[in-house]
UniProtKB/Swiss-Prot annotation:
GO terms for molecular function: rRNA binding; structural constituent of ribosome. It comes from Cycas taitungensis (Prince sago). Gene3D superfamilies: 1.10.287.1480. Belongs to the universal ribosomal protein uS14 family. Part of the 30S ribosomal subunit. This is Small ribosomal subunit protein uS14c. Keywords: Chloroplast, Plastid, Ribonucleoprotein, Ribosomal protein, RNA-binding, rRNA-binding. Signal peptide: none annotated. The keyword Ribosomal protein applies. Binds 16S rRNA, required for the assembly of 30S particles.
């Protein structure tokens, strides 16, 4: 199980990303539309002044049962070893046992 502080940090990043999503999109759109280099730099400075954790690249998917950040399957929201355990226990409909 992941530490609670890591999970809370990830939730904080998700909130910040949602808060600044529209602002970042509009600034990125402005950068692509403006032709003057000085204007692009000014808009880029505004973009850089937003918090680091507001970028979507800093988000990690986590297993909703264990909080593990590695080997996550998007379709299930589970990490690999939890997915395997649940499959063997017949808790996931439509999944078949495999030798992996």
């Amino acid at each position: 199980m992941a530490r609670k502080s890591l999970i809370q940090r990830e939730k904080k990043r998700q909130v910040l990303e949602q808060k600044y999503h529209s602002i970042r999109q509009s600034l990125e759109r402005e950068i692509s539309e403006v032709s003057s280099l000085d204007d692009k730099w000014e808009i880029h400075r505004k973009l850089q002044s937003s918090p680091r954790n507001s970028t979507p690249t800093r988000l990690h998917r986590r297993c909703f049962l264990t909080g593990r950040s590695r080997a996550n399957y998007r379709d299930f929201g589970l990490s690999g070893h939890v997915l395997r355990e649940m499959t063997h226990a017949c808790l996931l409909p439509g999944m078949k046992k495999s030798s992996w």
